[in-house]
Structure formats: structure tokens, C-alpha cells
């Protein structure tokens, strides 16, 4: 976890800071797993039509790859925009 996120907690006892850091870590893990599961579900649903064999055919594999790349690029852009908005709110004019 980025310790600078806890900068406003300087007045708290060290034990509470540690507890807050652990909570933030758990939330980040939960959000990462949620994003991964969403990616898998979306790309699988969009790209895999039949269950003829154990492996994906070339068309399915290509579709999954493109889908995952789009999803990750979109997620990164949303995260960057969110950070920009948060930075604008945190910085007084």
C-alpha cells in the first residue's frame, strides 16, 4: 500500500494506523479480484461460443486477447481520470 495515502492520519496512534493500512490493503485486494472476475466473465461470455474442445480456437483466443486488452486499457484510463479528479479536489484553488 502507498503509505502517503495515510498522511492525514498523523494524529492517530501507531496501532490505529496499522489497522487502517491493513483495511486499505484488504480493499485493494478485493477490488483487484473483482476486476479480474469481471474481466474473465465479460471476455469469456463475449468470445467463447461453443465447448467443442478443451482449448480455445484461434478466433476465440484472439477475441479474448483483444477483449482483455480493451478492458485493461479502459480500467487504467478510468483510474487515471479518477486520480486526476481526486487531485483537483485535494488541491485548493
UniProtKB/Swiss-Prot annotation:
It comes from the Eukaryota. GO terms for biological process: mitochondrion organization; protein transport. Keywords: Chaperone, Disulfide bond, Membrane, Metal-binding, Mitochondrion, Mitochondrion inner membrane, Protein transport, Translocation, Transport, Zinc. GO terms for cellular component: mitochondrial inner membrane. It is found in: Mitochondrion inner membrane. It is a peripheral membrane protein. Belongs to the small Tim family. The twin CX3C motif contains 4 conserved Cys residues that form 2 disulfide bonds in the mitochondrial intermembrane space. However, during the transit of TIM9 from cytoplasm into mitochondrion, the Cys residues probably coordinate zinc, thereby preventing folding and allowing its transfer across mitochondrial outer membrane. Heterohexamer; composed of 3 copies of TIM9 and 3 copies of TIM10, named soluble 70 kDa complex. The complex associates with the TIM22 component of the TIM22 complex. Interacts with multi-pass transmembrane proteins in transit. This is Mitochondrial import inner membrane translocase subunit Tim9. The gene is TIM9.
Amino acid at each position: 500500500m502507498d503509505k502517503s495515502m495515510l498522511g492525514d492520519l498523523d494524529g492517530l496512534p501507531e496501532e490505529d494506523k496499522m489497522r487502517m493500512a491493513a483495511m486499505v490493503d484488504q480493499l485493494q485486494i478485493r477490488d483487484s479480484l473483482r476486476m479480474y472476475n469481471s474481466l474473465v466473465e465479460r471476455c469469456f461470455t463475449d468470445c467463447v461460443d461453443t465447448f467443442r474442445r478443451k482449448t480455445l480456437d484461434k478466433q476465440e483466443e484472439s477475441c479474448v486477447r483483444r477483449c482483455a486488452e480493451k478492458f485493461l486499457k479502459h480500467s487504467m484510463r478510468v483510474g487515471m481520470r479518477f486520480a486526476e479528479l481526486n487531485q483537483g479536489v485535494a488541491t485548493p484553488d
